[in-house]
A protein has these predicted regions:
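Extracellular/periplasmic catalytic domains that process cell-envelope and extracellular macromolecules
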Residues: 49, 100-101, 113-116, 121-124, ...
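Boundary/entry segment of secreted carbohydrate-active catalytic domains
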Residues: 25-39
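Bacterial Sec-dependent signal peptides at the C-terminal "C-region" and cleavage site
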Residues: 8-28
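Structural recognition of the beta-strand scaffold that forms the well-ordered cores
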Residues: 56-58, 82-85, 108-109, 121-122, ...
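Primarily the HKD phosphodiesterase
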Residues: 44-106
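Positively charged n-region of N-terminal signal peptides that target proteins for export
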Residues: 1-5
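Signature of lipid phosphatidyltransferase scaffolds
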Residues: 127-176
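Solvent-exposed loop/turn segments at secondary-structure junctions
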Residues: 61-65, 87-91, 113-116, 127-128, ...
Length: 176
């Protein structure tokens, strides 16, 4: 009960911070999803399928086949995709890094930190997907996770600035 209360408080605080930082007319929209079994993966895939220009990803663990396939499908539609992953993905047995890089998606490894623990997507410079949800089957089916889909150009810009800092020190992943 305490953990749930803490999680609810943390999410509420995040929403208040986002709302207070948003300029008027930013057309802020927030959707929240929970797992297990709450449709987080489907929500992410739905957003990826709507992308028109660009999807930027930072992920710690990334083994979800539906999400990897949606990214590759977007790449085939001409959407620019770039993925930054934690250094542990080089050796993870079921990492999507090999699949995405072999399919032509620009994939990078961030080895500059003890753990590159971000879980974000920036879509078309206006939508941010973030939360505790790792892009994995376990996160969808077994773990207690949360996911936010936030439509805000200003927030997307803030996340983009941070994403670019991480890309600057990341190395291109060419697969195994």
């Amino acid at each position: 009960m305490r953990k749930r209360s803490w999680l609810t408080s943390a999410i509420s605080l995040l929403i208040l911070v986002v709302l207070s930082c948003s300029p008027q007319g930013n057309n802020l929209s927030i959707q929240v999803w929970f797992s297990p079994g709450g449709g987080c993966t489907d929500a992410i895939v739905g957003e990826l399928n709507k992308a028109k220009k660009e999807i930027l990803v930072q992920a710690y663990s990334f083994t979800s086949q539906p999400i990897a396939k949606a990214l590759v499908d977007a790449h085939k539609r001409g959407v620019r995709i770039e993925i930054i992953l934690d250094k542990s993905r080089r050796t993870e047995k079921y990492s999507a890094a090999d699949f995405t890089s072999h399919m032509g998606v620009s994939t990078y490894i961030d080895g500059a930190h003890a753990i590159a623990h971000n879980k974000i997507m920036i879509i078309d410079n206006e939508t941010v997907i973030t939360g505790s949800f790792n892009f994995t089957k376990a996160a969808e089916e077994r773990n207690a996770e949360n996911l936010l889909i936030i439509r805000s150009k200003q927030l997307a810009k803030d996340y983009l600035d941070n994403w670019e800092k991480h890309k600057a020190h990341s190395e291109k992943y060419i697969g195994r």
